[in-house]
């Protein structure tokens, strides 16, 4: 979400929620995020609270008029929903079994490695036909998907083996707003090279 906020040039303030301390389960946070998940934004100007990253991206795109072309919304929504319902959850499970808890479940590691490889295959195939996920223009579908592929070293799949996905990744990695938004929570963190 920080990438989107940087892309549209909105002023914002970050409130860090310490997941290791369980701050996301406190009653005040549950009032704004019923599933105790991050991210959440509070739009002070419009007195709105929005949870779930896909909903936040759509909201910010509609408010700013950027990265969500009305003439391409069906395509954008399909690729954004693919990220929300498949790419993010499956790569997230891969992170849990392969990166955070290796050796705890061979079944889990094998299953999510195969699914993650399939995701890379699918994205690479899609990007063989278009510059970005939903066509020739950079959209919220790319903004939502990019941070998951930016963890490619955790996946041990070899991003560099996917020509089109690597081209897309490098292209997005050069955007000033992406560079700034990616490291906003940790200034020492930089976008990994392919």
What are these regions (language model features)?
Residues 31, 174, 183-184:
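Phosphate-coordinating loops and pocket residues in cytosolic domains that bind phosphorylated ligands
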Residues 55, 176-177:
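Alpha-helix/helix-capping structural signal
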Residues 18, 140, 185-188:
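Short, solvent-exposed turn/loop segments enriched in Gly/Ser/Thr/Pro and often Arg
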Residues 179-194:
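Terminal-tail/helix-coil boundary detector
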Residues 22-23, 60, 170, 189-191:
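Short secondary-structure boundary/hinge segments and terminal tails
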Residues 61, 148-149, 182:
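Active-site-flanking alpha-helical
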Residues 1-111, 124:
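GST-like domain detector, emphasizing the conserved glutathione-binding G-site
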Residues 86-176:
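GST-like fold's C-terminal all-alpha helical module
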């Amino acid at each position: 979400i920080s990438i989107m906020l940087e892309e549209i040039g909105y002023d914002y303030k970050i409130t860090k929620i310490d997941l290791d301390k369980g701050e996301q389960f406190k009653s005040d946070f549950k009032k704004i995020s019923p599933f105790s998940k991050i991210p959440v934004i509070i739009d002070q100007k419009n007195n709105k609270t929005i949870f779930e990253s896909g909903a936040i991206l759509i909201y910010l795109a509609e408010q700013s008029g950027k990265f969500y072309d009305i003439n391409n919304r069906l395509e954008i929504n399909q690729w954004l929903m693919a990220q929300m319902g498949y790419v993010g959850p499956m790569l997230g499970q891969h992170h849990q079994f392969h990166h955070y808890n290796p050796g705890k479940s061979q079944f889990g590691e094998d299953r999510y490695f195969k699914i993650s490889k399939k995701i890379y295959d699918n994205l690479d195939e899609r990007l063989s036909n278009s510059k970005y996920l939903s066509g020739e223009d950079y959209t919220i579908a790319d903004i939502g998907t990019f941070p998951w592929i930016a963890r490619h070293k955790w996946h041990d799949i070899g991003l560099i083996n996917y020509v089109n996905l690597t081209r897309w990744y490098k292209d997005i990695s050069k955007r000033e707003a992406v560079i700034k938004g990616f490291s906003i929570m940790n200034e020492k963190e930089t976008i990994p090279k392919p």
